[in-house]
């Protein structure tokens, strides 16, 4: 019998007997474990061989045998739990232990660096599963980061300085305002072994032609081997950066026929997905990656929903052994913000916008927050920390305003915290705030109407590219803000948009009301090198490494 199964049987027997040695019979024990008398005898003999108990059998009708426990079920359960942790079987660990507080304590104690069979393993604790990693779909902040570790694109953007770099394409040139040419590397392989072909690249870029930022791509052809020509309907100075974004990452052309591709995707990036469940995401360094092989062999993201109730300001890489060290922190490039929905009469009413933005000002939200959040929140007066576009102007409550509807996407604890503060403030003004939580996909599509929306945005480098690109690619914003998005996109592509002025107009009209900038923190081990926090609050796994202990 496999050791794990035998351990489970012993723990169950120990629990049924309440850990007490006793006189009993094979029939009674078999009934406790719901097995045959013969199988019960085999179990007892095997457990006795392991040194867990003694079984002194008595022969004869009416005679009772002696069962003595030498090992406690708790000790064996702890040993089994340790084995499951080392094997990264978090789902089985949760079933075995049951108690969430104990599971969390065990997980935290095993965070950070592990060295097993010559491999460097990094363990990270996160509050929710990362089940959708499909480029071009609605991806949240962390899924966006993970997708960048799994997939490659024609170009890539350096997370530290925002500079454009080569990826699958090693060079490119602009032939004319409407014609770009990219030269691709040969010998690039997907994680499932097949070599990348030009048809994969063409299919990947054609599949996103329906997205607003890619709708101006008229044609994609390969005139010669490993050469790609992209023809546009509008000039686009940002095209090389646009092709380095997550939606433009390269998928195998047969991706729709592959099982569970969204949660177990196959790319050409530095890491391949090994496991992705509700309890764990495991990615492993791809030995055939066309660039520098990752220095960390394996990254395990353990999911523990209970930590969602804590302030989401830090990424925890290290357990409690010794003092936690703050490796890096930064104020996010982005903010939480209110979005007024012009499709509802209250959302479109300028008096309602002025008054709500006055009573729900950033300083009011921070003032009414608990101290643990005040340490991580900074009042926002623009979409970026360096901007001061919003001015707090006293406004009178509109006559007849008795209720408002606020909607945000679920699985985000700080949304609930901020919404609760808003509800408290508005109640003091005799306004009822009805709160709705919807899925991230529903939020992204924006087909549901709400007076106001609570959103957040994290912009990546370079900011003059990503800020408009991020806002333009969220359908919800286009539904709520009635401006000519296509005309603005054309001006942005031509380099004719003053981005700061454009954002200031959105804030001045109260279409968007900045609320809070968030401090992002990574805590971990001093032995980790090459760790540079990006604007998403994560770091590039393939560039990090562990320094060996001093000799």
Curated annotation (Swiss-Prot):
Transmembrane segments: none annotated. InterPro entries: SBP_5, SBP_5_dom, SgrR_HTH_N, Tscrpt_reg_SgrR. Residues 163-492 are annotated as: Solute-binding. Residues 1-116 form the HTH marR-type domain. Residues 26-49 bind DNA. GO terms for biological process: negative regulation of DNA-templated transcription; peptide transport; positive regulation of DNA-templated transcription. The keyword Cell inner membrane does not apply. Keywords: Activator, DNA-binding, Repressor, Transcription, Transcription regulation. Gene3D superfamilies: Periplasmic binding protein-like II (3.40.190.10). Disulfide bonds: none annotated. The keyword Phosphoprotein does not apply. One of its GO terms (molecular function) is peptide transmembrane transporter activity. It comes from the Bacteria. NCBIfam families: PRK13626.1. Activates the small RNA gene sgrS under glucose-phosphate stress conditions as well as yfdZ. Represses its own transcription under both stress and non-stress conditions. Might act as a sensor of the intracellular accumulation of phosphoglucose by binding these molecules in its C-terminal solute-binding domain. HAMAP family: HTH_type_SgrR. This is HTH-type transcriptional regulator SgrR. It comes from Escherichia coli O1:K1 / APEC.
């Amino acid at each position: 019998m496999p050791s794990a199964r035998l351990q489970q049987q012993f723990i169950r027997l120990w629990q049924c007997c309440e850990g007490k040695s006793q006189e009993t019979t094979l029939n009674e024990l078999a009934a406790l474990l719901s097995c045959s008398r013969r199988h019960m005898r085999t179990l007892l003999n095997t457990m006795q061989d392991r040194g867990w108990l003694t079984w002194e059998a008595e022969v004869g009708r009416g005679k009772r045998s002696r069962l003595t426990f030498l090992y406690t079920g708790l000790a064996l359960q702890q040993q089994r739990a340790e084995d499951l942790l080392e094997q990264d079987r978090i789902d089985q660990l949760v079933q075995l232990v049951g108690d969430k507080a104990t599971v969390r304590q065990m997980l935290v104690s095993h965070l950070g660096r592990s060295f097993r069979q010559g491999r460097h393993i990094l363990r990270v604790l996160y509050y929710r599963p990362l089940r959708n990693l499909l480029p071009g779909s609605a991806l949240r902040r962390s899924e966006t980061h993970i997708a960048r570790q799994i997939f490659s694109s024609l170009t890539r953007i350096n997370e530290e300085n925002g500079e454009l770099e080569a990826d699958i394409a090693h060079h490119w040139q602009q032939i004319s305002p409407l014609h770009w040419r990219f030269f691709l590397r040969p010998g690039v392989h997907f994680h499932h072994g097949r070599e990348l072909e030009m048809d994969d690249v063409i299919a990947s870029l054609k599949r996103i032609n329906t997205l607003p930022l890619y709708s101006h791509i008229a044609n994609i052809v390969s005139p010669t081997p490993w050469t790609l020509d992209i023809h546009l309907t509008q000039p686009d100075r940002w095209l090389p950066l646009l092709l380095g974004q997550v939606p433009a990452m390269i998928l195998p052309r047969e991706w729709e026929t592959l099982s569970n591709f969204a949660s177990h995707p196959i790319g050409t990036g530095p890491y391949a997905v090994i496991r992705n469940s509700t309890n764990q995401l495991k990615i492993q360094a791809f030995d055939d990656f066309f660039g520098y092989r990752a220095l960390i062999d394996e990254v395990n993201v353990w999911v523990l929903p209970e930590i969602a109730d804590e302030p989401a300001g830090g990424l925890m890489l290290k357990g409690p052994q010794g003092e936690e060290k703050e490796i890096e922190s930064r104020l996010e490039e982005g903010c939480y913000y209110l979005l007024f929905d012009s499709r509802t009469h209250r959302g479109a009413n300028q008096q309602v916008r002025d008054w709500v933005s006055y009573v729900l000002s950033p300083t009011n939200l921070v003032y009414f927050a608990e101290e643990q959040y005040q340490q991580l929140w900074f009042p926002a007066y623009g979409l970026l920390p360096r901007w001061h576009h919003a001015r707090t102007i006293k406004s009178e409550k509109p006559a007849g305003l008795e209720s408002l509807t606020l909607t945000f996407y679920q699985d985000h604890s700080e949304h609930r915290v901020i919404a609760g503060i808003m509800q408290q403030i508005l109640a003091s003004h005799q306004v009822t705030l009805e709160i709705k939580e919807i899925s991230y996909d529903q939020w992204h599509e924006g087909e549901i109407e709400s007076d106001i929306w609570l959103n957040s945005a994290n912009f990546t480098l370079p900011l003059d590219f990503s800020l408009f690109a991020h806002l333009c690619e969220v359908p919800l914003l286009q539904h709520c803000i009635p401006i000519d998005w296509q005309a603005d996109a054309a001006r942005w592509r031509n380099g004719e948009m003053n981005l700061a002025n454009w954002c200031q107009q959105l804030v001045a009209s109260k279409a968007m009301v900045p609320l809070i900038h968030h401090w992002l923190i990574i805590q971990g081990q001093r032995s980790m090198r090459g760790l540079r926090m990006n604007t998403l609050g994560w770091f590039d796994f393939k560039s990090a490494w562990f320094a060996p202990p001093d000799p």
